[in-house]
Swiss-Prot record:
The lineage of its organism: Eukaryota, Metazoa, Chordata, Craniata, Vertebrata. Residues 448-473 form a propeptide. Belongs to the Nogo receptor family. The gene is Rtn4r. The keyword Membrane applies. LRR repeats lie at residues 56-79, 80-103, 105-128, 129-152, 153-176, 178-200, 202-224, 225-248, 250-273. It comes from Rattus norvegicus (Rat). This is Reticulon-4 receptor. N-glycosylated. O-glycosylated. Contains terminal sialic acid groups on its glycan chains. It is a lipid-anchor; GPI-anchor.
Length: 473
């Protein structure tokens, strides 16, 4: 009985103390105030058009969400030195005084989301909030992030900026957020990611950039993101990623790149090579160009599929034109550097042109090979061409009726090492080099070269003999 009586006395004492506290600490009329688990002033969905006065100074949590508050004046919560949580989301905020949160040095959570008319926040609004670890600014109609907006928020871990109208991501915006682990930027209109956009985010674990207009990512934009585990870039305007972009992401486990107009040509090789080594979970990377690869997953292509440079001939067009070329519109380099395999098809000075070489048969003006031009030419007409070994038919093919001119061989011309200075004669050297595959001096070119030589070089007697055998030149 004594134990039951003792328990009842304690309960009665607790109720009396709570009533006394409520009397001693007045609560705004539209609010409910309670002390457990933390001292709380709760005024949600009461139709309030302004921040209520008379909020208990001992409040640790203040809930003002779901009202019609349009403005937060300076020092609205200055007396609440112990405040750790402040919810102002889902109101009609169109402005916040730069000194509205002055004195809230212990504030940990600030929710300003779902205030579509806010649009602009003064860069000094969050100064002094050194303990803030969660900040909601999503769905606030923000068009820009002012310089220094997040300065001094060293404890911030969660930053929600999704579903705004952000049109740029300035350098060094998040530089002071060394402890930030989650950054939500999806659902904006960000067109590119500059070099220092994420500078200083050494602790970032999750970065959501999907559903923007991102067409370019600077090669070093992710340089400080060595701890990043989740990266969403789907539903953007990306057609390629530079080779260096993903290299710093040593901890990456989840990657989504789908719903982008990827160009799967030689410029996609760096991304393709990185994806072959990636051991985490990744989405498909469907190709947009060229047409022959449209819809196929870049990850599943062979290296040989990524040759040449595609042209933007498909239905895709980027968001902004500004009279740029297709490559500039797509954010692509203008051409690809040939790799080792590609270089084999590039004609080099001093090398014979292959049958499939694009330069074959092209002669610059004034570079016509020397010769009398009387017979058909079998030599490559390019400046770097050489006489094919089969260009000259054997002399036996030129004999009429089995006649054999005196002094000439009955077999095809034999390759000679060259003429010595002692016996070198013009006719001797030319006859010895015909059909050898070397252009030499360039005089013996074409199937009619030997008759021409006989006419122009031989002594008169030899010329007459050749005339009767071979016919006129």
């Amino acid at each position: 009985m004594k134990r039951a009586s003792s328990g009842g006395s304690r309960l009665l004492a607790w109720v009396l103390w709570l009533q006394a506290w409520r009397v001693a600490t007045p609560c705004p009329g539209a609010c409910v105030c309670y002390n457990e688990p933390k001292v709380t002033t709760s005024c949600p969905q009461q139709g309030l058009q302004a921040v209520p006065t008379g909020i208990p100074a001992s409040s640790q949590r203040i809930f003002l969400h779901g009202n019609r508050i349009s403005y937060v004046p300076a020092a609205s919560f200055q007396s609440c030195r112990n405040l750790t949580i402040l919810w102002l989301h889902s109101n009609a905020l169109a402005g916040i005084d730069a000194a509205a949160f002055t004195g809230l040095t212990l504030l940990e959570q600030l929710d300003l989301s779902d205030n579509a008319q806010l649009r602009v926040v003064d860069p000094t609004t969050f100064r002094g909030l050194g303990h803030l670890h969660t900040l909601h600014l999503d769905r606030c109609g923000l068009q820009e992030l002012g310089p220094g907006l997040f300065r001094g928020l060293a404890a911030l871990q969660y930053l929600y900026l999704q579903d705004n109208n952000l049109q740029a991501l300035p350098d060094n915006t998040f530089r002071d957020l060394g402890n930030l682990t989650h950054l939500f930027l999806h659902g904006n209109r960000i067109p590119s990611v500059p070099e220092h956009a994420f500078r200083g985010l050494h602790s970032l674990d999750r970065l959501l950039l999907h559903q923007n207009h991102v067409a370019r990512v600077h090669p070093h934009a992710f340089r400080d993101l060595g701890r990043l585990m989740t990266l969403y870039l789907f539903a953007n305007n990306l057609s390629m990623l530079p080779a260096e972009v993903l290299v710093p992401l040593r901890s990456l486990q989840y990657l989504r790149l789908n719903d982008n107009p990827w160009v799967c040509d030689c410029r996609a090789r760096p991304l393709w090579a990185w994806l072959q080594k990636f051991r985490g979970s990744s989405s498909e990377v469907p190709c947009n160009l060229p047409q022959r690869l449209a819809g196929r997953d870049l990850k599943r292509l062979a290296a040989s599929d990524l040759e040449g440079c595609a042209v933007a001939s498909g239905p895709f067009r980027p968001f902004q034109t500004n009279q740029l070329t297709d490559e500039e519109l797509l954010g692509l380099p203008k051409c690809c550097q040939p790799d080792a395999a590609d270089k084999a098809s590039v004609l080099e000075p001093g090398r014979p042109a292959s049958a499939g070489n694009a330069l074959k048969g092209r002669v610059p003006p004034g570079d016509t090979p020397p010769g009398n031009g009387s017979g058909p030419r079998h030599i490559n007409d390019s400046p770097f061409g050489t006489l094919p070994g089969s260009a000259e038919p054997p002399l036996t093919a030129l004999r009429p009726g089995g006649s054999e001119p005196p002094g000439l061989p009955t077999t095809g011309p034999r390759r000679r090492p060259g003429c010595s200075r002692k016996n070198r004669t013009r006719s001797h050297c030319r006859l010895g080099q015909a059909g050898s595959g070397s252009s030499g001096t360039g005089d013996a070119e074409g199937s009619g070269a030997l008759p021409a030589l006989a006419c122009s070089l031989a002594p008169l007697g030899l010329a007459l003999v050749l005339w009767t055998v071979l016919g006129p030149c």
